[in-house]
A protein has these predicted regions:
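A generic structural signal for secondary-structure junctions
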Residues: 64, 94, 103, 142, ...
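Generic beta-strand hydrophobic packing signal
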Residues: 8-10, 292
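C-terminal coupling/interaction segments
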Residues: 271-311
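Non-catalytic surface loops within mature trypsin-like serine protease
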Residues: 29, 124, 234, 270-272, ...
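ABC transporter nucleotide-binding domain
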Residues: 173-270
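ABC transporter nucleotide-binding domains
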Residues: 2-5, 12-206, 212
Length: 311
């Protein structure tokens, strides 16, 4: 696999606290990579090391196969969780200032900013001071500033914080569009539904250690609990009776009022030694079977189980 970024055995301590302990990970080029973990796990420390804001005590970070340098940081667009716009400056003036710092000519910066401001519907903000903007409005501006110079690696730390659902969805779509245009995105968040929507791969850090890494779909499949959702038409007693000796019957996946009007549902876990085909055959003999699907755990469930040590 072609990796744009590799971290090898990164460790970092602060005044007796081990923020990162021998963390290694590889980020595939052209992916959205989720960096997950509870508060204080070490995610922000890792991001700061990648951006060369702080240095690791040991280990190395490679960008395109070689040790990352200060000059490489220009290839990175970083949107920190702590937003950092100058409140007294006008929006347009400030956006051009940061674009110039990132190597864009003034004319090119103005041209690209015009396109982004039109895309986000914020043309009227150009001459407004940042202090006049709401948190969500300022966040839109900082997102544009982060991506304007077309960095090959983007790092977003809790990018949806402060956004309403409509603007959060807009930002998700733009992140995926940036990936599709060739950028690699590191995405740090606590929002597991967003992880399922946009992340291709993840690493989960807990108590300074990397405890889980891989492709999102593969991780979800790997940690399934052999639970199946059955939808059927027919007598509930017949459905339960035909599988009672073969399966653990669990609570239905939704309250009865939310079930489809023409189907009933069950959650089943086959007993040890019982094959799925036996369960399907038994159900087919008792009711009209309409669906039989493995229940894949959500990333939220996997996160909780991994952090609690029950995965």
């Amino acid at each position: 696999m072609d990796n744009i970024l590799q971290a090898e055995h990164i460790s970092k301590s602060f005044t007796g606290h081990k923020a990162l302990n021998d963390v290694s990970l590889s980020i595939p080029r052209g992916s959205v990579y989720g960096l997950l973990g509870p508060n204080g796990a070490g995610k922000t420390t890792f991001i700061r090391i990648v951006n060369r804001i702080t240095a690791p005590d040991s280990g190395s970070v490679l960008l395109d196969g070689r040790p990352i340098t200060d000059d490489d940081v220009r290839r990175i667009g970083y949107l920190p969780e702590e937003r950092g716009l100058y409140k007294k400056m006008k929006v347009g003036e400030q956006a051009i200032f940061f674009a110039r710092l990132n190597g864009l000519a003034r004319s090119e910066a103005r041209r690209q900013l015009k396109l982004w401001f039109e895309k986000f519907g914020i043309e009227s903000w150009w001459d407004r001071k940042v202090e006049e903007l709401s948190k969500g409005m300022a966040q839109k501006v900082q997102f544009i500033i982060t991506v304007l110079h077309r960095p090959s690696l983007l790092i977003f730390d809790e990018p949806f914080s402060g956004f309403d659902p409509v603007n959060a969805q807009l930002l998700k779509e733009e992140i995926l569009a940036l990936r599709d245009r060739g950028a690699t995105v590191i995405f740090s968040t606590h929002n597991m539904s967003s992880v399922e929507e946009i992340c291709d791969h993840i690493t989960l850090i807990n108590k300074s250690h990397n405890i889980l890494s891989g492709a999102v779909d593969e991780i979800r499949r790997r940690h399934g609990e052999n639970i199946f959702e059955v939808s059927y038409r027919g007598d509930e007693a017949a459905a339960r009776g035909c599988v009672a000796s073969r399966c653990q019957i669990m609570e239905p996946p939704t309250p009865a009022s939310e079930q489809p009007s023409d189907c009933a549902r069950l959650l089943l876990r086959p007993c040890e030694g019982v094959e799925v085909r036996e369960v399907i055959a038994a159900l087919n003999g008792a009711v009209e079977l309409r669906g039989f699907t493995e229940v894949i755990p959500s990333m939220n469930d996997i996160f909780i189980r991994a952090v609690n040590g029950t995965l």
